[in-house]
Amino acid sequence: KIEVESENNLYFYLFQYSPDLTNTKGDNKNFVRLFPNQLDANNYFKKGSYKIPSNNKYDLLLTLEANEISTNELIVALALRKEVSFKQAMTFANFNKILSGIKLVDRREAHIPYSVNKR
């Protein structure tokens, strides 16, 4: 579970960034929206504490491709003053284009690196 502590009302988004999916043209959709999703759609948080998932209908799992031994990825958490429509999967360029259109005073972001290793 991921815990979010909010001091203000905000719209919260959670993404997984997998740089290994990027090809030389940057065409691959390596940003995947984890939250909000079909099972947990309410991403408007008032001041307070929240957990994702907010219910026990799903888990956030880390996996490797069949041919991978390990990978380094990133969780990107965004807190925004206004709601933004993010697609389920985006290229690095598309994600950054949307993000650059949001003023710094209207967003907070956290980047959480992690590794997944085969046992």
Task: Describe the residue ranges of each PLM region.
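Secretory-pathway glycoprotein ectodomains that are cysteine- and/or Ser/Thr/Pro-rich
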Residues: 1-119
